[in-house]
Amino acid sequence: MFYWLYEQFAASGYVPILNLLKYQTFRTGLAIFTAQFVVVAMGSRFIRWMQAKQGKGQPIRAEGIERHVIEKAGTPTMGGVMILAGLLVGTLLWSDLSNPYVWAVVLVTAGYGLLGFTDDYAKVTRQTTAGVSGKIRLALEAFIAMAAVLIIIVFAQKPPENPELLTSVTFPIFKQYFVDLSWGYLLFGAFIIVGAANAVNFTDGLDGLATVPVMIAAAAYGLIAYLVGNYVFSNYLQLHFVPGVGEIAVFCGALIGSGLGFLWYNAPPAKIFMGDTGSLALGGAVGAVAVATRHEIVLAIIGGLFVAETLSVIIQVAWFKRTGRRIFLMAPIHHHFEKLGWSESTVVIRFWIVAIMLALVGLATLKLR
């Protein structure tokens, strides 16, 4: 919205300060502060309201960690509503709303947030850990993801040097190579977005565990978006130039700000859980940003923590079905370490460290070739 004001009045020279709004870095900073303020401001009242409405709070897995059943019982869920409020307000206020990349990632974030909310509502009202049918949810996730990818393919500005880049997969290190999937990119892009959403959903099992790694990934991809959306920087780093995608940095800033605001209430011991409302929305957002910037493969590195959590579940289920035995004491893998005797805070902080290191490795691939 404010970028529109800049476009309307900056040329007149009557309000010189509006010229600051042409800088994506300036608007990204404002998006961080705005989103954080919104979440912190609404947090206390929203949590009290959720406690009154939900009563027993989020159901805790009876077969899970014993102390969780005792310590976390009664904690309300759906805190993702707070995250979405800050994220969407920060994005809509400070980004260029004529940019199709912005609307694509907003569609995924809001759509997945709504799906997660429906899932959380079912769990709370039925007091069960099973929500909406997995197949139905997966189908809706795929539909929303393909709609977002279609927006990018149809409406985004085509790179002048490589117009086919909008439907292509690029590779880290091997920067000069890309594979044009044509309309098959709809399926590939949807796979990345759906996979990222559910990977973050698996990770969200301890206080603050998913929030910080998502912010780290958002910071990394915010930098990537700014670089590949700038012709000078992308040319220097020999990255594929993606015109217009730099605006995604503002969205990433709002994501970081909303995450910081939520962490104020989600730090151990959590006063509220983000629930599927938050984890699906945040994971989908990260996946959509990876698709928009054409750095989908790098997400496996930057989001390596989420990949590890997902693989631990897949391996555990597959091995148990085949042999009747478990490889991990409990999956996802963060619960395995709890079963080994690690405290919750130890698991969370060490996983944060891993997320930081993986993000740095992922960013390092921008320079390697």
Swiss-Prot record:
E.C. designation(s): 2.7.8.13
Catalytic EC class: transferase
Reactions performed catalytically: UDP-N-acetyl-alpha-D-muramoyl-L-alanyl-gamma-D-glutamyl-meso-2,6-diaminopimeloyl-D-alanyl-D-alanine + di-trans,octa-cis-undecaprenyl phosphate = di-trans,octa-cis-undecaprenyl diphospho-N-acetyl-alpha-D-muramoyl-L-alanyl-D-glutamyl-meso-2,6-diaminopimeloyl-D-alanyl-D-alanine + UMP
Topology class, membrane: Multi-pass membrane protein
Compartment(s) where it occurs, according to its Swiss-Prot or TrEMBL record: Cell inner membrane
Transmembrane segments: 30-50, 74-94, 97-117, 136-156, 177-197, 208-228, 244-264, 272-292, 297-317, 346-366
A molecular function (GO) term: metal ion binding
Protein origin, superkingdom: Bacteria
Keywords: Cell cycle, Cell division, Cell inner membrane, Cell membrane, Cell shape, Cell wall biogenesis/degradation, Magnesium, Membrane, Metal-binding, Peptidoglycan synthesis, Transferase, Transmembrane, Transmembrane helix
Pathway(s) per entry: Cell wall biogenesis; peptidoglycan biosynthesis
GO biological process, one term: peptidoglycan biosynthetic process
Cofactor(s), by name: Mg(2+)
One cellular-component annotation, GO: plasma membrane
HAMAP family, A to Z: MraY
Classification via PANTHER family: PHOSPHO-N-ACETYLMURAMOYL-PENTAPEPTIDE-TRANSFERASE (PTHR22926), PHOSPHO-N-ACETYLMURAMOYL-PENTAPEPTIDE-TRANSFERASE HOMOLOG (PTHR22926:SF5)
Family that this chain belongs to: Belongs to the glycosyltransferase 4 family. MraY subfamily.
Job description of the protein: Catalyzes the initial step of the lipid cycle reactions in the biosynthesis of the cell wall peptidoglycan: transfers peptidoglycan precursor phospho-MurNAc-pentapeptide from UDP-MurNAc-pentapeptide onto the lipid carrier undecaprenyl phosphate, yielding undecaprenyl-pyrophosphoryl-MurNAc-pentapeptide, known as lipid I.
Identification of the protein by name: Phospho-N-acetylmuramoyl-pentapeptide-transferase
Originating organism: Phenylobacterium zucineum (strain HLK1)
Organismal lineage: Bacteria, Pseudomonadati, Pseudomonadota, Alphaproteobacteria, Caulobacterales
Gene this chain is encoded by: mraY
